[in-house]
Design a protein with these regions (language model features):
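Catalytic-core regions of glycoside hydrolase
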Residues: 105-106, 161, 173-176, 181-182, ...
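Aromatic-lined, polymer-binding surfaces characteristic
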Residues: 236-261, 274-279, 286-296, 627-644, ...
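C-terminal non-catalytic alpha-helical accessory regions
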Residues: 437, 441-710, 716
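Feature activates predominantly on carbohydrate-active enzymes
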Residues: 2-5, 13-24, 28, 65-259, ...
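Glycan-association/targeting regions that enable binding to alpha-glucans and other polysaccharides
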Residues: 720-855
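Conserved, mostly hydrophobic/aromatic
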Residues: 29, 87, 155, 283, ...
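Short, well-ordered secondary-structure micro-motifs within conserved domains or adaptor modules
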Residues: 38-65
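Short, flexible loop/turn elements at secondary-structure junctions
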Residues: 87, 132-134, 169, 235-237, ...
Length: 855
């Protein structure tokens, strides 16, 4: 179908954001050589009829418009297209879908795609956070108005409904005081305005620059509102030791202990008055934001400043250290309020919420210090997950934040995981997710480099704006968070336009590659902190104790070695050390082992490799867009092989450490060599492509590149070679126990996701027994594992009993009588194999447990 012109028929009551979306559609059509104008739906030629809410389209509808907010439908008959939205945002999404088709169409029909298309949101909140951490690198994008127009348009096009400009997140008070250098926007208020009645200023900052900063903030907020986006301003720091940071590049003058709270209160009210488009504020409410835990008076005053603005402003409180007193303070303001825990530590794992936190995250008997009495004391279980926030009758939102510890540089784009996040972000009454965008923390703590956000040293690889490398990433993430069943053409049209005949291989490669580092992050967790653990550019944790202490020693229990690094889900995964102990004890486990993880990683590596080989046969390989994708896919494939071999080597290493049996050395060395070879290949790829120093912080483990990590990885292999004999390792033969463990390791069979039939209610009544029945191929007594949806608690288990052709078990009413929902799974055996039901499926994107909601 060809188009001579297009008439866009807007309803009389169309909002500004709907008008903007219609204008954007017209602009895209004009670029494609097709004139457009506003007019009547009854006009001739091609008509895009825009229908709001309960309005009646002039064209009979073959579909029903969903009742959910932000839903939309597109359908057409001949040259007449109906864009039908439940509300303004739904209409924006419908019109931007048509604009997107017109922008990326490669055929005659510029609106080609799925018709009819009906979509409704899964995650209610779909937020993107952009962090200002470096004066050197971030002022460039902060002051670029066209960059903001394009960036915010991209977010609206991809179904995001919130943008968070995040300030003050670059340091953690007081732990980072010695590192404080670049403090631009760290304590944000005096960088933006003069607050009457307070003699507070940034000594080195001119009034002109301060005023420019505020005008830019106003501009960004207006542009977000124009596109129908909520504008969240995240203010992570409320104070630091202003007089005890001699290396800081800006000086905060005039703040005292006495006037801090009144100043912040007045500043918040003024800021919200000056920028009326702000819809919410995010606060870090534990000690790292500068306020000692338990100093509730400060927050009462600060939140009063929010309420004084005279309009609804969402008060979003970062989850770490959050207690019920803080929730009550927010509640008493009358403002909408939310808690935003971390999704999985400060990393990105698989989409499901971890079944259990690390042992180190359970509350200690005594808090580490008085000012950390919550985050390192009674509320420690909330440091890195949802804690006890998901009660049945909660009156606040729970919005998860995915931190950028896992993957910062390489392009990500797996539709499977993105759809999984769309489903799991609503877990047990949750409300959505905020993603710290690619390159978050770039140039942090004074490590900014001019032009550093582009990362490439090879000419011709950089995009105009740094975020444009990740266009596909934003697309897949936003659209599948919104609608996990979104049609494939919604991302393939982009790849077809940008990557030509390599499009399908780019899609496959990014899907395989996108699972690699989330899987590694979930299963290998030497540190929860993104300030220490960066699996993408990995600081090597050795198989035998040695190096690694500085990067990881503060955050994992000794011994500090690869096989003892905890997982981020101890309910479903065992470490190599735990696995070796089970083997030596002649026991088995229902949990996934490091060898299961290695097998998954090997499959992902093969998928990456095949996609690269196929893409190299295409004519489009010369395109920078294809090259950017394929080199990152190849690097991820190499990382998958590296970690697969490290996991395998760790199993042999842990048996060797426990027994000193000499025959264990060769298989250990074999896998260690393969790991080094995989990293050498990654280094070869990165050496001429990426800069030597990718800076995300001043410490060695937060900077560098794959090729600069190579010497430490090769050095470990040389150390391991010495285990062959001599020195303190004499020849030791295996006794019966050791030989049994070796034989069991060699004969190991993978844990599989179960195919058992489960019969259980989707909901329950508190105080009533909750019955679970299973049937299918079962070899021995299955076990029901269950827990409240509360990370402060540990899992319980009960053996299921035979009942007819299946097994049954009950979660007792005394246990269900709580304020929490339930989660559960079943472990069993089949033909000698451990079976988890439901377990993780082949896409690694599902929830490996069932959830029953309290009615």
């Amino acid at each position: 179908m060809t188009y001579a012109s297009v008439t866009i028929a807007l309803p009389a009551e169309a909002s500004d954001s709907v008008g903007w979306a219609a204008s954007e559609l017209g602009t895209v059509l004009k670029r494609r050589g097709i004139p457009s104008a506003e007019g009547s739906a009854a006009g001739g030629g091609t008509v895009v009829e825009v229908v709001t809410g309960n309005g009646k389209p002039s064209l009979n509808s073959p579909v029903e418009l969903p009742g959910k907010e932000e839903s939309f439908a597109l359908y057409r008959e001949g040259a007449h297209i109906v864009a039908w939205g439940r509300d303004d945002r739904g209409l924006v999404f419908a019109l931007m879908e048509l604009a997107d088709r017109a922008r990326y169409s490669t055929g005659e029909d510029i609106f080609e795609g799925t018709f009819p298309l009906v979509e409704k949101p899964s995650a209610r909140i779909r937020s993107m956070a952009r962090l200002f951490c470096s004066e050197e690198e971030d002022k460039v994008w902060f002051y670029d108005k066209q960059q903001w127009r394009d960036y915010l348009t991209m977010l609206a096009s991809n179904r995001f409904n919130r943008f968070s400009l995040t300030l003050g997140m670059g340091y953690n008070y007081p732990y980072h005081n010695p590192w404080i250098t670049d403090v631009y926007f760290y304590f944000p208020y005096p960088f933006l305005m003069k607050v009457p009645g307070f003699d507070v200023e940034i000594v080195e900052l001119s009034e002109e620059e301060r005023d420019t900063n505020l005008e830019m903030l106003k501009f960004i907020a207006r542009e977000a509102a124009k596109r129908g986006l909520e504008f969240q301003l995240a203010l992570w720091t409320q104070r630091y030791d202003f007089d005890d940071v001699p290396r800081a590049n800006y000086t905060v003058a005039g703040v005292t202990d006495a006037n801090l709270a009144p100043y912040c209160r007045a500043a918040l009210t003024q800021l919200l008055t000056e920028v009326p488009e702000i819809t919410g504020l995010t606060f870090r409410v534990h000690v790292e934001g500068g306020i000692a835990e338990g100093e509730y008076g400060f927050w009462e005053e600060a939140f009063a400043g929010v309420a004084a603005a005279g309009r609804p402003i969402e008060i979003d409180m970062h989850g770490k250290g959050l207690d019920h007193k803080m929730l009550q303070i927010a509640r008493e303001t009358g403002m909408p309020f939310a808690a935003s825990p971390k999704y999985l530590a400060e990393h990105m794992g698989l989409p499901y919420h971890q079944s259990a936190i690390r042992d180190r995250e359970y509350p200690p008997e005594v808090a580490r210090s008085e000012r950390e009495k919550l985050s390192e004391g009674s509320r420690k279980f909330l440091r890195y997950s949802y804690g006890d926030l998901l009660t049945k009758d909660k009156d606040y939102k729970v919005i998860y934040r995915i931190w950028a510890g896992t993957q910062r540089v390489l392009l990500w784009g797996d539709p499977d995981l993105a759809a999984g996040y769309g489903r799991s972000s609503m877990f047990a009454g949750s409300d959505g997710v905020e993603w710290c965008e690619p390159q978050s923390f770039k140039g942090r703590m004074g490590t900014g480099i001019p032009g550093g956000r582009f990362n490439y040293q090879k000419q011709g690889m950089a995009t105009r704006y740094d975020w444009q490398k990740y266009d596909y990433q934003y697309r897949v993430w936003g659209r599948l968070l919104y609608h996990p069943e979104a049609p494939r053409d919604s991302w393939m049209r982009y790849l077809a336009r940008e990557c030509g005949d390599a499009a399908e291989y780019c899609e496959k490669g990014l899907s395989f590659a996108g699972k690699v580092l989330p899987l590694v992050s979930l299963t290998h967790g030497p540190s929860v902190s993104n300030n220490h653990y960066w699996p993408e550019v990995y600081t090597n944790l050795p198989l035998i104790e040695g190096t690694g202490q500085r990067a990881y020693g503060f955050d994992m229990d000794a011994p500090v070695r690869f096989g003892n690094a905890p997982t981020f889900d101890s309910a479903l995964f065992v470490t190599a050390r735990e696995y070796a102990e089970l083997l030596l004890a002649g026991k088995t486990s229902h949990r996934y082992t490091p060898l299961d993880i290695a097998d998954w990683l090997e499959e992902l590596a093969e998928g990456c490799n095949q996609a690269v080989l196929d893409a190299k046969k295409t004519a489009s390989l010369v395109s920078p867009a294809v090259q950017r994708i394929m080199v990152d896919v190849e690097i991820c494939g190499g990382l998958a092989r590296f970690f697969a071999e490290k996991f395998r080597a760790a199993c042999w290493a842990e048996l060797f450490i426990a027994t000193k049996v000499s025959s264990l050395v060769e298989p250990l060395l074999d896998h260690a060599r393969r790991a080094v070879m995989a990293w050498e290949r990654v280094a070869d790829i990165s050496r001429d492509l990426y800069h030597d120093d990718l800076t995300y912080g001043p410490q060695s483990w937060l900077r560098g590149s794959w090729h600069t990590r190579l010497p430490q990885i090769q050095a470990e292999l040389l150390d391991l070679e010495s285990l062959r004999g001599g020195g303190k390792y004499e020849s030791v033969k295996a006794d019966g126990t050791a030989q049994g463990a070796i034989d069991a390791l060699k004969a190991r069979r993978a844990v599989v996701a179960g195919s058992l039939d489960i019969e259980a209610a989707a909901s329950f009544t508190a105080g009533a027994d909750f019955d679970v029945r299973i049937s299918g191929q079962i070899e021995d007594e299955p076990v029901l594992h269950y827990r409240h949806v509360n990370q402060a608690e540990r899992w319980k288990s009960v053996k299921m009993v035979r009942n007819g052709d299946g097994y049954v078990a009950s979660i007792p009413g005394d246990y269900t009588r709580s304020e929490f929902h339930l989660q559960y799974f079943v472990s069993s055996k089949r033909n000698g194999q451990a079976v988890l039901t439901p377990g993780l499926d082949g896409k690694l994107a599902n929830e490996p447990y069932y959830t029953a909601l309290q009615s």
